Amino acid sequence: MATAGKVIKCKAAVAWEAAKPLVIEEVEVAPPQAMEVRVKILFTSLCHTDVYFWEAKGQTPVFPRIFGHEAGGIVESVGEGVTDLAPGDHVLPVFTGECKECAHCKSAESNMCDLLRINTDRGVMIGDGKSRFSINGKPIYHFVGTSTFSEYTVMHVGCVAKINPAAPLDKVCVLSCGISTGLGATINVAKPPKGSTVAIFGLGAVGLAAAEGARIAGASRIIGIDLNANRFEEARKFGCTEFVNPKDHDKPVQQVLAEMTNGGVDRSVECTGNINAMIQAFECVHDGWGVAVLVGVPHKDAEFKTHPMNFLNERTLKGTFFGNYKPRTDLPNVVELYMKKELEVEKFITHSVPFSEINTAFDLMHKGEGIRCIIRMEN
């Protein structure tokens, strides 16, 4: 492309300080360096993780910053050493990477790349420790290696998944984070047998994706647990067959579930990060074969406490990161699930706004309205 090797001027939504509305600014985006890719973002969506770090609730607040990590785009140019991507390729950026060289990437059992594992503190590229974004010569920092709230962004090649060019980017862009995380937690980690009973704790986007995974796997009962009863009707679209609101009961949730299921559920997936819900999700699975999977990220000081007999009685507790999907290897296959109409992505998309109204997406998330809001970069 004519812009290859040159600085591109484009619009980006800059967070100048914590919890203040994003400002659409003209930024300069430097060309990709070795093992980097510059991508034209066409559609992006807002994830709770963006909001969490924008509010500076994360470890080390870094500002000014360009947030965004769920997106779909087209490769504009590639840096030296990039061989498996070319200008024009359709891609999904991913907040975690796959270098294909480290012990984790070479293991069939792990997706936690040593080189490109998520780092929320780092606001620069790993190659040279510099940002590719600037305004008047001053750096604007990156977020989780993606920064998709910009018309153009630069990423390490390991954080870019090449997908089927026929897949509509305005739909599959939501697969680059939360939806795949929930889906994979059920399909790849919990692995519910056909006809089994699955409990889903938390019915936000990730929990609904976990329910969708249970539906695809053929679970016969999918029990949604949430403190917000307003979420129950929507959750039926994702396969939930019944619901428990802990506020409606004067006994522990694990006891309620045991009574509903003749001793416990076969599988549970915890998507809230609330430490009590995590313990409940483990203690509600059936002895002998029950498996609980933790997806939600807990408070840094949280401690998981349960009696060791819960393990000795053959219950299994697992954790998962990004649904155990390797970004570059596996994400194209998740897109194909959508293309084959096995995965219904449209159900997750409840709102759409032009880039100029990106702050509306933040407002919707704060109000708890909808599931995913697509932000259209070109009006």
Swiss-Prot record:
**Molecular function as annotated in GO:** alcohol dehydrogenase (NAD+) activity; S-(hydroxymethyl)glutathione dehydrogenase [NAD(P)+] activity; zinc ion binding
- Broad class of the protein's primary localization: cytoplasm
Q: Where an alcohol is bound, by residue? A: 49, 69
> At which positions is Zn(2+) 2 bound?
99, 102, 105, 113
One cellular component term from this protein's GO annotations in UniProt: cytosol
Residues reported in the UniProt entry to bind NAD(+): 49, 202-207, 226, 231, 272, 295-297, 322, 372
State the compartments where it is located.
Answer: Cytoplasm
Q: Which reaction does it catalyse?
A: a primary alcohol + NAD(+) = an aldehyde + NADH + H(+); a secondary alcohol + NAD(+) = a ketone + NADH + H(+)
Q: What is its EC number?
A: 1.1.1.1
Give the residues the record marks as binding Zn(2+) 1: 47, 49, 69, 177
Describe cofactor binding as the record notes it.
Binds 2 Zn(2+) ions per subunit.
Q: How does it assemble?
A: Homodimer.
State the family it belongs to: Belongs to the zinc-containing alcohol dehydrogenase family.
- Protein name stated in the entry: Alcohol dehydrogenase 1
Give the gene symbol.
ADH1
